[in-house]
Amino acid sequence: FRVGGFAGRVIERMGGVPQNIPGGEIYQALEKGTIDAAEWIGPYDDQKLGFNKVAPVYHYPGWWEGGPQLDFFINDKAFNALSAENKVIVECAAAFAHTEMQAMYDARNPTALKQLVGAKTKVLPFPQDVLDLAFKESMALYEEISTKNPNWKKVYDDYAAFRRDQNLWFRFTEMRFDQFMQSKKL
């Protein structure tokens, strides 16, 4: 399974064998059977690269990445050396790039998904037991790292508290609205 980072560590805990293969080599690895599956970006990019021609089953949701998060990294010393005006310019440019990229994928992924289905790609949900095991092993990994790395623990504890609050809020807003809209024929 081509996946890297934390997701690869979770796959390993689940009994899989993660492979860290560069994006440009995924198609060939799937075609040759070097790997059985690959995590990449989403329908738009997956279809553009033709992955469905060599891996005709498309599983969702991507439990390793509930949604995209585009990051911008800058050296702290370099950023702090900027004028107040230039700091705002960098912050605004980063925010704009994130919003623009998110909007682009939100616009292109539905069409690409339809085209994948039209090309006879089987789009299937991960079985619930797989999602549950991935969640369990993810949480165990985060706790394991927390016991070994105080910096991680500090950041993770803050993140986990924020996530709990967000999950509560989303149950009343986003999730209920999404469920409602998905139940309607548009």
Predicted regions and their residues:
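N-terminal secretory/targeting leader peptides
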Residues: 1-186
